[in-house]
């Protein structure tokens, strides 16, 4: 027969085994619950961190784009400044061109070809006398007026048909300078 103590030992062992199994299950469930919560928190904060990193990248890219635009504007401003300096230098050297024999012959050729009686010829203030002499030499009847906006050359107005032909140095210089701007920029800045 089994003694009470042995019986108690068996019951205690059996209950301990049941309790141990239950505690193992409870521990496993608790660990799973902790793991799930940890994974959930990790996913949440990982998403938040990714969002913050993405936002920071976008801000950096936006700032980079803004700075690129500012740099391009500054460079363009400098380029335009120096191109304008070249243009101003060209305008200052027009006196040499206007005193040349080729210029005078070209001006006379334009007047010979385009002038009609009754026309009005506009020219720079310093060329009025010269243009009047040319018109007299051509034996044409035309009025000569000075135009302070004209640097050189002439504009011929045909009043009878309402037409003005522009042979001024202003127009020629603007057209030539505009077409040569890329070459001038290449010379000044090493660009095409």
From Swiss-Prot:
Q: How does it assemble?
A: Has multiple subunits with at least A(3), B(3), C, D, E, F, H, I and proteolipid K(x).
Report the membrane topology from the UniProt record.
Peripheral membrane protein
Q: Which InterPro entries match?
A: ATPase_E_C (IPR038495), ATPase_V1_Esu (IPR002842)
Keywords tagged on the record: ATP synthesis, Cell membrane, Hydrogen ion transport, Ion transport, Membrane, Transport
Q: Which organism is it from?
A: Metallosphaera sedula (strain ATCC 51363 / DSM 5348 / JCM 9185 / NBRC 15509 / TH2)
The record's subcellular location field reads:
Cell membrane
Query: A GO biological process this protein is involved in?
Result: proton motive force-driven plasma membrane ATP synthesis
Q: What name appears for this protein in its UniProt entry? A: A-type ATP synthase subunit E
Which family does this protein fall into? Belongs to the V-ATPase E subunit family.
Query: Might you report a single GO cellular component term?
Result: proton-transporting two-sector ATPase complex, catalytic domain
UniProt GO MF annotations: ATP binding; proton-transporting ATP synthase activity, rotational mechanism; proton-transporting ATPase activity, rotational mechanism
**Chain's role:** Component of the A-type ATP synthase that produces ATP from ADP in the presence of a proton gradient across the membrane.
Gene name of the encoded protein:
atpE
